[in-house]
C-alpha cells in the first residue's frame, strides 16, 4: 500500500486520455487505473514531458505499469532516478517494466526477467 498523501491522481493529468489508450492496449481500462490508485496500490507520476502510473506489487517491487509522453530518451534517466528513490522510500527492492523492444533499447542496464525488465535497487 502506498501512502495516501503521496498518491497523485492520473485522471487529473493532461495525459489522462493517453494513459487510458495505453491501458486499453494492455487489456485494461481507465476504471482499472482509478480503482488501483483509489485503493492505494498505484500512483501517478508526472515526468518532464510525460506521465507514468506506478504500481506496488506483492513482492516489494514497483512496477511502471503505464507510461506515455514525448521525448522519452530526454527524461527517462531523471525519471528512473526519481522513481528509484521513491521505490526505496516505500520499501521496494526493484523496479519492473514491461520488456518491449523499445524499453530494452532505452534501458540496456536493466535485467530481462521473463517478459519484463527489472532494475535491482538493493545494490
What is each stretch, according to the model?
Residues 1, 122-123:
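Short intrinsically disordered terminal tails
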Residues 59-109:
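Acyl-donor binding region in acyl/amide transferases
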Residues 98, 112-122:
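Conserved catalytic-core motifs of GNAT/GCN5-like acyltransferases
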Residues 21-42:
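Active-site rim helix/loop that mediates acceptor-substrate recognition in acyltransferases
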Residues 38-74:
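Conserved donor-binding loop and adjoining core beta-sheet/short helix segment
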Residues 2-7, 52, 110-112:
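Generic structural motif
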